């Protein structure tokens, strides 16, 4: 027999799929800012934020919304092999494949980009850009200087990546979209909207402001941490629902189970 908490648990599997995008006030503002930035004559745009603030799903949402309107390409997984990466870039720019054993002539590629300036405007979304080497970042910068290809680069906000951004792109990035952890209100809307989207009305209604406040205390409004906590909460609920049902009240959300999840994840030390 399948527990209803199984479906609630799966709602909070960390994902960048478009169907899992939740439109919060803050995320809508970030999306509109990014969409507006694409229309400006900018060569590079930086999407900046701590891990778990929604950079990947924002890029994917942008790509899915614009892929039939613009010459836009999304590199969701970093390709750290320079030769492989520029094979992909070559295909994006020239719309042709190179034989696998052929190296990209970078100077020729830059010249090609200059030749198509004003004829095409290519947008490349690079996620997890902190994985690219300094040399690759420099070549990305040189390609962007051609003004026929625009890069939107997502970076984790850490001290090291802050330095990378300043060193390599300070004079070329004219727009920065910074994503932050959500507020208490964002967290409440996020949790409720995720559950309501899957028609889990009773469970959503059982999670009151007090419970949200406790979850927020542990997650600090970070969406990845919020997902982890809720997934673990419903995993515990699912276990009791299947094996010891009298331990849970289906009509009331449990502070004790929130704390059990927090202990399991290391937010509370005992």
Residue ranges with predicted function:
Residues 27-39:
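Pre-Walker A adenine-sensing motif
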Residues 44-51, 132, 143-167, 177:
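Sensor-1/coupling segment of RecA-like P-loop NTPase cores
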Residues 94-118:
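Central P-loop NTPase core of STAND/AAA+ ATPases
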Residues 7-15, 19, 80-100:
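Conserved NTP-binding/hydrolysis module of P-loop NTPases
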Residues 66-79:
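Conserved catalytic segments around the Walker B and adjacent sensor/switch elements
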Residues 1-20, 32, 52, 57-64, ...:
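C-terminal alpha-helical "lid" subdomain
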Residues 19, 112-136, 140:
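Conserved P-loop NTPase "ATPase switch" module shared by AAA+ and STAND
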Residues 76, 174-187:
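Conserved AAA+ ATPase "SRH/arginine-finger" region at the nucleotide-binding site
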């Amino acid at each position: 027999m399948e527990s209803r908490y199984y479906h609630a648990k799966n709602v909070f599997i960390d994902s960048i799929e478009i169907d899992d995008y939740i439109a919060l006030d803050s995320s809508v503002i970030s999306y509109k800012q990014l969409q507006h930035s694409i229309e400006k004559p900018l060569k590079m745009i930086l999407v900046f934020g701590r891990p778990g603030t929604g950079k990947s799903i924002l890029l994917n949402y942008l790509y899915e919304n614009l892929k039939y309107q613009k010459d836009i390409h999304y590199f969701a997984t970093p390709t750290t092999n320079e030769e492989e990466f520029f094979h992909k870039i070559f295909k994006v720019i020239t719309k042709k494949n190179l034989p696998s054993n052929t190296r990209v002539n970078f100077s020729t590629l830059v010249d090609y980009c200059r030749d198509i300036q004003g004829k095409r405007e290519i947008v490349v979304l690079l996620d997890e850009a902190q994985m690219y080497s300094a040399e690759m970042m420099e070549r990305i910068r040189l390609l962007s200087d051609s003004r026929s290809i625009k890069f939107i680069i997502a970076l984790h906000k850490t001290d090291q990546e802050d330095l990378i951004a300043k060193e390599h792109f300070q004079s070329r990035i004219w727009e920065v979209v910074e994503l932050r952890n959500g507020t208490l209100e964002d967290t409440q809307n996020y949790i409720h909207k995720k559950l309501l989207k899957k028609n889990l009305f009773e469970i959503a209604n059982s999670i009151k402001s007090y419970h949200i406040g406790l979850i927020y205390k542990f997650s600090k409004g970070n969406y990845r941490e919020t997902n982890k906590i809720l997934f673990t909460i419903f995993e515990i609920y699912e276990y009791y629902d299947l094996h010891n049902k009298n331990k849970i009240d289906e009509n009331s959300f449990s502070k004790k189970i929130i704390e059990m999840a927090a202990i399991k994840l290391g937010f509370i030390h005992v």
